[in-house]
């Protein structure tokens, strides 16, 4: 299991209701169900990945989160997980609003467009960077709204979204993001991980 999922699983308590949006092949869901006894559901737009999840015995529906989340009742989950998916939505603000409506808490992870390798690539090559967390060319990327860790934190403050925990991942190492180290983490972190409500 990738390090990001390990961090997410440590945030989520046992025996809780969890919705994983953009759940992929169900790796995180499977772990949360088997090891933490969580009641886990998934929402995934790709039919082949939905079929992989179902083959693992996971409860997943095929659908577009921007259209389907409105159908979930208010506070119907303890946690809603959105892992490296926020940037692909046409309206990420509305998706965040829906996460916070249907979940008591949400865990959002974002690839950090402020990472120093991304900055240098843009500066010296003048082209969109390709990294571990941003593996696509500009013309075939699903990413529409890239942001930095700092921008996400600023957005949450502006919208009065409470950040309960903020961490970052760099080269498989996890560390906490604080007001004092924000500038440093915004430059040297590949991924931001946030627990919000």
Task: Enumerate the predicted regions with their spans.
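Conserved alpha-helix/loop element of class I SAM-dependent methyltransferases that forms part
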Residues: 1-15
């Amino acid at each position: 299991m990738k390090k990001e999922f390990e961090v997410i699983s440590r945030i989520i308590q046992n025996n809780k209701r969890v919705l994983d949006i953009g759940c992929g092949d169900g790796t995180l869901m499977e772990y949360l169900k088997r090891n933490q006894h969580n009641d886990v559901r998934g929402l995934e737009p790709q039919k082949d990945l939905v079929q992989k999840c179902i083959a693992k015995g996971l409860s997943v529906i095929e659908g577009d989160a921007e259209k389907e989340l409105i159908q979930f009742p208010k506070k119907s989950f303890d946690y809603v997980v959105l892992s490296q998916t926020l940037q692909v939505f046409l309206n990420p603000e509305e998706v965040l609003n829906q996460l916070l409506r249907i979940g008591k808490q949400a865990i959002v992870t974002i690839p950090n467009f402020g990472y120093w390798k991304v900055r240098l690539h843009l500066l010296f090559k003048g082209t969109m960077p390709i990294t571990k967390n941003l593996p696509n060319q500009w013309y075939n990327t699903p990413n529409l709204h890239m942001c930095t860790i700092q921008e996400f934190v600023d957005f949450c403050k502006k919208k009065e979204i409470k950040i309960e925990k903020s961490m970052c991942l760099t080269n498989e190492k996890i560390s906490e993001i604080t007001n004092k180290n924000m500038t440093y983490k915004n430059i040297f972190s590949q991924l931001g991980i946030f627990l919000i409500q």
